[in-house]
Swiss-Prot record:
InterPro entries: Pept_tRNA_hydro, Pept_tRNA_hydro_CS, Pept_tRNA_hydro_sf. GO terms for biological process: protein quality control for misfolded or incompletely synthesized proteins; rescue of stalled ribosome. The lineage of its organism: Bacteria, Pseudomonadati, Pseudomonadota, Gammaproteobacteria, Candidatus Pseudothioglobaceae. It catalyses: an N-acyl-L-alpha-aminoacyl-tRNA + H2O = an N-acyl-L-amino acid + a tRNA + H(+). Keywords: Cytoplasm, Hydrolase, RNA-binding, tRNA-binding. Hydrolyzes ribosome-free peptidyl-tRNAs (with 1 or more amino acids incorporated), which drop off the ribosome during protein synthesis, or as a result of ribosome stalling. Belongs to the PTH family. Its EC number is 3.1.1.29. GO terms for cellular component: cytoplasm. This is Peptidyl-tRNA hydrolase.
Length: 191
């Protein structure tokens, strides 16, 4: 099994581009830059799509242009069109329960309160997809979460998040080729 679709979760528009909640977009944009892909608006997919080639494999990148809590609509449309199995999807998202500077790979599981994952699980009807969780840290109190994710990280936090994104870029090729154990071992030992 290989990864055919990488989805970066985030909110569309310039007002949100530097927010912690857009960490998924940041990784997809870095991948497009690294592998010479160009995002194009695809209204039928409710998103921006780029196609890249990694290790001789065609991989699509998707940044939904709907808000986070409607991400499933965008993902479902591209999955149906290209007949992609859910276990061939990697969803990249911000993770409150992981400190900045750390990224973790996970397969299956719940949404952990993440509205983008919640909608995706509900729309796809399954939790059986890969996740790349980019740590952004937690504000400390549940009542502060919305404000926290919808603001930019501090300079120090951003440096740590960028470091975890760079570490994540180094294991993408392994994930594309189905070497999940190697990718996990490599990424999880960079903490």
């Amino acid at each position: 099994m290989t990864i055919k679709l990488i989805v970066g979760l985030g909110n569309p528009g310039k007002d949100y581009q530097s927010n912690r909640h857009n960490a998924g977009f940041w990784l997809c944009e870095a991948l497009a830059h690294l592998y010479a892909g160009n995002f194009k608006k695809e209204t039928k997919f409710f998103g921006e799509v780029a196609q890249i080639n990694i290790s001789g494999r065609k991989v699509r990148l998707l940044k939904p242009t709907v808000f986070m809590n409607c991400s499933g609509q965008s993902i479902q449309s591209i999955v149906n069109f290209y007949q992609i199995n859910t276990n061939e999807i990697l969803i990249v998202h911000d993770e409150l329960d992981i400190d900045p500077g750390i990224a973790k790979i996970k397969f299956d599981g719940g949404h952990g309160g993440h509205n983008g994952l919640r909608d995706t699980i509900q729309t796809l009807g399954t939790k059986a997809f890969h996740r790349l969780r980019i740590g952004i840290g937690h504000p400390g109190d549940k009542s502060q979460v919305t404000n926290f994710v919808l603001h930019a990280p501090s300079k120090g936090e951003l440096e740590k998040i960028q470091n975890s994104l760079n570490n994540s870029l180094q294991i993408i090729e392994d994930m594309i080729n189905g070497n999940f154990d190697k990718a996990i071992k490599t990424l999880h030992t960079k903490e």
